[in-house]
Curated annotation (Swiss-Prot):
It comes from Salmonella choleraesuis (strain SC-B67). This is sn-glycerol-3-phosphate transport system permease protein UgpA. The gene is ugpA. The keyword Cell wall biogenesis/degradation does not apply. SUPFAM superfamilies: MetI-like. Residues 76-284 form the ABC transmembrane type-1 domain.
Length: 295
């Protein structure tokens, strides 16, 4: 089988086409990452006018800081909850809508609505519903004797930010899962049904293996979302409290750099977070993707 190779009239045209993306990558990714790495090795004054090379002292101080270690483990727990809860809930709804025959369009539209809501607005929405004094959900919980106050209870605060973050991401995951389920040939599903496989067995033995590549893609995307894009939710809902119970690494970087004006510590934390995400992504690509098999 012969391979097709595009031929350009000018040898500079391919480089010209790639140039805009390269410029964007350098300006918005490589340059900031390089500056963060440089500042992490410096002792910088609060206004950034003077600096002194200190080597790895910022990293040593970082891992001797109990508050940073708490934020590190909070990030791991928070990211795991957001990633796996979001994937499971989205897959469940996608499977239900795929199974529904009548009113499918209505449910699809309903599931996509949260994606149009900004993260900070989503957090404020759920704060109103979980307001300890006037919230509709807290009033309902109070009828069963459960007191809710996420401003004082660290477990409830964590639940609130996880819940709001998952709700915001459901639409994105649903869109990909539903499209993947719709792409499965109906003939395969009908053949499995004729062989006596029920809906649940068809899902686990047929549909789930066939959408494994999409599941892997969403696993990586949701992990990055939990690490970085949940900052507005945490800032609007709990501001990292109570007692730093919901302070993740990305929120601690913001607080150290923009509130505390400790640019060196903030840069060192950024570098650690960057390498952590890179390591997790590489592990997923090497070990999780290798498990993707069709049955």
């Amino acid at each position: 089988m012969s391979s097709f190779r595009p031929v350009f009239r000018s040898r500079w045209l391919p480089y010209l086409l790639v140039a805009p993306q390269l410029v964007i990558t350098v300006i918005f990714f490589i340059w900031p990452a390089g500056e963060a790495l440089w500042y992490s090795l410096q002792s910088v004054d609060p206004f950034g006018f003077s600096s002194q090379f200190v080597g790895l002292e910022n990293f040593v101080a970082l891992f001797h800081d109990s508050y940073y270690l708490d934020a590190f483990w909070t990030t791991i727990k928070f990211s795991a909850l957001v990633t796996f809860s979001g994937l499971l809930v989205s897959l469940f709804f996608a499977a239900l809508v795929d199974y529904v025959v009548r009113g499918s369009r209505f449910y699809q539209t309903l599931m996509l609505l949260p994606y149009a809501v900004a993260p900070a607005v989503a957090a404020v929405l759920w704060i109103f519903l979980f307001n300890p004094g006037r919230g509709l959900i807290t009033h309902f919980l109070g009828e069963f004797g459960y007191d809710w106050n996420h401003a004082q209870n660290s477990g409830q605060a964590m639940f609130l930010v996880v819940f709001a973050s998952v709700w915001k991401q459901i639409s994105y995951n649903f869109l990909f899962f539903f499209a993947a389920l719709q792409s499965i040939p109906r003939s395969l599903v009908e053949a499995a049904a004729i062989d006596g496989a029920g809906p649940i067995r068809r899902f686990f033995r047929l549909s789930l293996p066939l959408i494994a590549p999409v599941s892997f893609f969403l696993l990586v995307v949701n992990l990055v979302y939990a690490f970085f894009d949940t900052f507005p939710v945490i800032d609007a809902a709990t501001a990292g409290g109570p007692v730093q119970a919901t302070t993740t690494l990305i929120y601690k970087i913001y607080r150290e750099g923009f509130t505390g004006l400790d640019l060196s510590a903030s840069a060192a934390q950024s570098v650690v977070l960057m390498f952590l995400v890179i390591i997790l992504t590489v592990v997923q690509f090497r070990y999780v993707e290798s498990k993707v098999r069709y049955q």
